[in-house]
Amino acid sequence: MSAAVAPTCKATMYVCGITPYDATHLGHAATYLAFDLIHRLWLDLGHEVHYVQNVTDVDDPLFERADRNGVDWRDLAEREVALFRDDMASLRILPPHDYVAATETIVEIVELVDKMLVSGAAYVIDDEYPDIYFRADATLQFGYESGYDRDTMLRLYEQSGGDPRRPGKNGELDALLWRAARPGEPSWSSPFGPGRPGWHVECAAIALSRIGIGLDIQGGGSDLIFPHHEFTAAHAECVRGERRFARHYVHAGMIGWDEHKMSKSRGNLVLVSTLRAQGAPPSAIRLGLLAGHYRADRFWSSQLLDDAIARLHRWRTAASMPAGPDVADVIARVRGYLADDLDTPKAIAALDGWVTDALEYGGHDAAAPKLLATAIDALLGVDL
């Protein structure tokens, strides 16, 4: 992954947001922390940044959870979005320029689906519910984003709720664009009948309407590589031409707990709000997540948090000293490591080295501790 853009250009980034039916867990936090680092790195390089993040507030898990809990799905979404944003603020994750819900973008989604119908990239299944599907072969570029073979695509498509064997589909990998209204489900009016959008077209419409085609980074967790990011790109490209949807596709690794991927379906979530309520310093949570490389699948543990708390204490002690060693070299190294695929483990190791020298030997530069604290704040988002 290269986060570089031309020095005078606006840097653009679209990151897939949450489905707001449960609280923010550390897997979410790790993903948005990775893109926060890119955001901060771009700002440090002097770029203007246009960062867009969506909220998937039209999706089956949200409706099912609201029905199970006996609450209105809109109220549930509003509550969980508020908690998510509070958690992100506590972790000092810079907010996106545009924070857009799918429900705010129905007009743009309908326009996109209509264009695909007119062009032949989409078709209607003629059965009891006239759902609209996107033809996976509508763009010759389909498959470039993931690089997966067909068998892998089919497996992941089905695992994510796809319906490869639905009667009437032209192709097994064709993706749902518009789900015709069913009794008891939310729906919106459209020229092709009431219904609601499919998952992938929501992000395509939001990204195209807020940024346009050819954005610098499309990002999210590694579980979104296929089908979500592949189809989001394909939807956008078949409407706007064959120009690629994004210059770079960047994916954060999964966070596990108890030897398993952390997920709502598995029920092994470590919630940011719970850690905060237990007294964990948000900066330590952030440091704990930064201790591993953003692309790596890795496990969270109580020991990892304890180590991060101890590191935070050492860093703060060094930053409060009246003087310290020169910081020019270590700040340059941190910038270099972050520019090299966000190598936070090496950046942290470099900072640990300076802190050790400062605590053991002191220094003669009265400005050094404050300068380093400012750099750590700006580049890593850790408040000393």
Swiss-Prot record:
A motif ('ERGGDP' region) lies at residues 159-164. It comes from the Bacteria. Its cofactor is Zn(2+). Binds 1 zinc ion per subunit. It catalyses: 1D-myo-inositol 2-amino-2-deoxy-alpha-D-glucopyranoside + L-cysteine + ATP = 1D-myo-inositol 2-(L-cysteinylamino)-2-deoxy-alpha-D-glucopyranoside + AMP + diphosphate + H(+). Disulfide bonds: none annotated. A motif ('KMSKS' region) lies at residues 261-265. The keyword Oxidoreductase does not apply. Its EC number is 6.3.1.13. InterPro entries: Cys-tRNA/MSH_ligase, Mycothiol_ligase_MshC, Rossmann-like_a/b/a_fold, tRNA-synt_1_cat_dom. GO terms for biological process: cysteinyl-tRNA aminoacylation; mycothiol biosynthetic process. The keyword Lipid metabolism does not apply. Gene3D superfamilies: Anticodon-binding domain of a subclass of class I aminoacyl-tRNA synthetases (1.20.120.640), HUPs (3.40.50.620). Monomer. Catalyzes the ATP-dependent condensation of GlcN-Ins and L-cysteine to form L-Cys-GlcN-Ins. This is L-cysteine:1D-myo-inositol 2-amino-2-deoxy-alpha-D-glucopyranoside ligase.
